[in-house]
Amino acid sequence: MKRRTDPECTAPIKKQKKRVAELALSLSSTSDDEPPSSVSHGAKASTTSLSGSDSETEGKQHSSDSFDDAFKADSLVEGTSSRYSMYNSVSQKLMAKMGFREGEGLGKYSQGRKDIVEASSQKGRRGLGLTLRGFDQELNVDWRDEPEPSACEQVSWFPECTTEIPDTQEMSDWMVVGKRKMIIEDETEFCGEELLHSVLQCKSVFDVLDGEEMRRARTRANPYEMIRGVFFLNRAAMKMANMDFVFDRMFTNPRDSYGKPLVKDREAELLYFADVCAGPGGFSEYVLWRKKWHAKGFGMTLKGPNDFKLEDFYSASSELFEPYYGEGGIDGDGDITRPENISAFRNFVLDNTDRKGVHFLMADGGFSVEGQENLQEILSKQLLLCQFLMALSIVRTGGHFICKTFDLFTPFSVGLVYLLYCCFERVCLFKPITSRPANSERYVVCKGLKVGIDDVRDYLFAVNIKLNQLRNTDSDVNLVVPLEVIKGDHEFTDYMIRSNESHCSLQIKALAKIHAFVQDTTLSEPRQAEIRKECLRLWGIPDQARVAPSSSDPKSKFFELIQGTEIDIFSYKPTLLTSKTLEKIRPVFDYRCMVSGSEQKFLIGLGKSQIYTWDGRQSDRWIKLDLKTELPRDTLLSVEIVHELKGEGKAQRKISAIHILDVLVLNGTDVREQHFNQRIQLAEKFVKAVSKPSRPDMNPIRVKEVYRLEEMEKIFVRLEMKIIKGSSGTPKLSYTGRDDRHFVPMGLYIVRTVNEPWTMGFSKSFKKKFFYNKKTKDSTFDLPADSIAPFHICYYGRLFWEWGDGIRVHDSQKPQDQDKLSKEDVLSFIQMHRA
């Protein structure tokens, strides 16, 4: 229930407030020279006497303290100086109730703090009160005028080199050895002094800053930061994806000078690449994701914690990549600065690329220079040289090279770039948007290795030997190309200076931006998500999360790969070749044949050593293959497990090998509908990609040698009688393959590769084969699409000529059983029907 206000009672109160207001007005007009304390005490005395008279008039008891508080609150609101005018009346009244007087502290003796408590300037996890001397100063760099972030990038190439590639005689006195130099501030030959000192100063500012605080600010400041690694192993993979796109896929789809692709997925040649100083392997994971089993990689990196992490290749098949660590092979140390390792890796790569070398080399070397960031270029000079040397050692003529560099201020580093400029058709220095703008990282990109670079390679090899000799001494190689030679090429020098100064300007702005973002934690780049989406779309990278490949049992994976095909097909057994069935092999040009060494099986690869076999009967299960080998996931093959032999007598060695008869799915690529010849060609390409010459402990994988039926006599030339270990000294029939290993043959598979109603004939007029349709009577020299026999037709219609007892296919064997098909019978039939 509300209490009614009595007008007579409220009148004295209004009168009292009027008097207080008048007094407050007089106090507020007090001179600024008058001490605040006298004003306060005067006010207090006046209010005390005033409150006493008013309480008697009202006839109601009021304590002097309560009125004193009310007066002080009102005086704070209306009569205090402008120093406190920013605070609202409520907060001022609260302070007044606690006894606050302007210019005095709280407490009985006014001993409290007199000044206002400042807002906290605490940053991150720094200790309370910690200030970083040197960091909190202003950099005086305007970073806000940086260009708008964009996914589009421009490439600026060095002008084409018109001078001859230097030879041994010319380079004989180029190497200059002098006192070891450990300062960078005076390296102004290829960069303006002011810019150089500015970038070094900006870097030095961050020396006192906590690393985590720096990283958080950098993450907010970089508009491209959210690109990260997507579904790859690390950010390096996305750098390669970025640069591969910018350079028109010159790495994953190299072309000749006429724009024609050098390698095609449907052709036999692999795309060979190498990855050095590259652990854990992000560059290679990207290339293998893009090319799948159409590429083969070789890698060398330092053994240890930064080794290749092939088990973490989630998006690509690491079985297509072969690490080799130089001298000692898989047991080497991978140190690229050791001449023995460079030579060993070069020989290994050439031996496994038909002596041609790789199509391109990627090098991403670097090591921690914590506390010496400004000297990174000097500390990394030998690493840079060895990566350049490796390019000239293993890249094929016309091939490409990409390598990470840091600052390029010293004449030593610029001299190395000059040698690349002489040895490649085109060279450029490029910083991708996936490389953080504040660091000194850049990439030298080289296109089209020239002929005749051997002398430069030998020269760099000699320089590396000298660097190793001078290690831990006060001397060093200071020049690899004389300054007058470099500066004599004005176009090269101008590009080098422009590139360095442009890079310095970019770094300075980026460092200043991070500095500002450290100081103000509310700053952020608003378009990070938008830019990320735009970049992934442009580079052709799906926006997917990184997840480990799901595990699967072989049976489920088999049904997934055959995609609804009738499973009964896989239980078909070949038709035995007899005198009666021999008549069906007409014309002979429709058929191919292969030597059998054991029973046919289906083999499925689920990744790494997860390999299973199945004999085709629905009642039987998939069985784990007890061999040491690896295959990419999503692979389905028709194979034999053959016991191969090498040598004779007691020294004879036996090894189990996988022989491929036909292929269905290769690393997720369904090839069943392609021509048999094409499937065999792709199988050979696949085997090259997965083979591991550096691992003699692994069981080999081979593709059966396929013969035209009309050339069957070539098979019998490869047959001979050999003594098999454990066969009581009795010679047995052996077939020797292309790799000089032999096995005991069980018979011959004969496969029809032309689909009905098409058949093949031989034109005597044109001296070549043609295709003939038995229904339409059409004939053509070009392969008709509907004449191709897919896998299930080839598998269902195959024949098998068993070479058991009573079959004489070699002159040293026992006499022929007259009731069985002889070698002569078959050869005479072929001769009769191929004319």
Swiss-Prot record:
Substrate binds at K203, S204, V205, F206, D207, R218, N374, L375, Q376, N439. Residues 37-54 have a biased composition (Polar residues). A motif (Bipartite nuclear localization signal) lies at residues 2-19. GO terms for molecular function: mRNA (nucleoside-2'-O-)-methyltransferase activity; nucleic acid binding. The keyword S-adenosyl-L-methionine applies. It catalyses: a 5'-end (N(7)-methyl 5'-triphosphoguanosine)-ribonucleoside in mRNA + S-adenosyl-L-methionine = a 5'-end (N(7)-methyl 5'-triphosphoguanosine)-(2'-O-methyl-ribonucleoside) in mRNA + S-adenosyl-L-homocysteine + H(+). Keywords: Acetylation, Methyltransferase, mRNA capping, mRNA processing, Nucleus, Phosphoprotein, S-adenosyl-L-methionine, Transferase. Coiled coil: none annotated. Induction: By interferons alpha and beta, and by Vaccinia virus infection. PROSITE patterns: G_PATCH, SAM_MT_RRMJ, WW_DOMAIN_1. The active site is at K239, D364, K404 (proton acceptor). The modification N6-acetyllysine is found at K108. Residues 57-67 have a biased composition (Basic and acidic residues). Its EC number is 2.1.1.57. GO terms for biological process: 7-methylguanosine mRNA capping; methylation; mRNA processing. The keyword Acetylation applies. S-adenosyl-L-methionine binds at N234, C277, A278, G279, P280, G281, G282, F283, D335, I336. Residues 1-67 are annotated as: Disordered. Residues 231-450 form the RrmJ-type SAM-dependent 2'-O-MTase domain. It is an enzyme of class 2 (transferase). This is Cap-specific mRNA (nucleoside-2'-O-)-methyltransferase 1.
